[in-house]
A protein has these predicted regions:
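Short loop/turn segments that flank or connect secondary-structure elements
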Residues: 1-169
Length: 169
């Protein structure tokens, strides 16, 4: 049974943070068959409609690539220069990100709907980076410990992955 309640995800993700860090170390010390992790991720993705949640849009910064800027400007029917002025800002690490507010998150989020979904940036399209990402899932575990505190897909996948690997909790 998957958990999708965001309050419960936050609470359990924070409660399990130390355990998830131990799980990350556990995965690094052994050789795993990527297929089992991917299969578990595919199952969870199929059970949870990402578009019903949009929590990632509220809590994360979306770093932009040049092609994201080109694509979004074209989608919105404006010049790239205007897009940069109206819809971007500098992130905490100095990178170019989509404009956001602490209260509402991403500038393109309206309730739980992405108003530019068809043209969303590559980082948004690939999120939560379980099925789409560079390297094996175990090699990207550093990303998932924090994401398990706000993303139902990552939280539920991580719990299944612990069961798959017979990780002692």
């Amino acid at each position: 049974m998957v958990i999708t309640d965001l309050v419960q995800i936050r609470r359990m993700g924070e409660k399990n943070r130390d355990e998830n860090l131990r799980f990350r170390k556990y995965l690094k010390t052994r050789v795993w068959v990527e297929r089992q992790f991917r299969h578990a991720a595919e199952e969870v993705h199929a059970e949870i409609d990402c578009r019903q949640c949009a929590e990632c849009c509220r809590v994360t910064e979306v770093q932009l690539a040049k092609r994201d800027i080109e694509h979004l400007a074209k989608f919105l029917g404006i010049r790239e220069k205007d897009f940069l002025e109206q819809y971007t800002m500098t992130g905490v690490d100095g990178e170019l990100i989509l404009k956001r507010t602490a209260a509402a998150g991403c500038v393109f989020l309206d309730g739980n709907e992405c108003t530019v979904y068809e043209a969303r940036p590559g980082n948004c399209e690939r999120f939560p980076h379980l099925l789409k990402g560079a390297g094996s899932i175990p090699s990207r575990m550093w990303q998932f410990v924090d994401r398990a505190t706000y993303c139902p897909i990552v939280y539920n996948w991580m719990e299944r992955a612990k069961d798959l690997t017979k990780f002692r909790r």
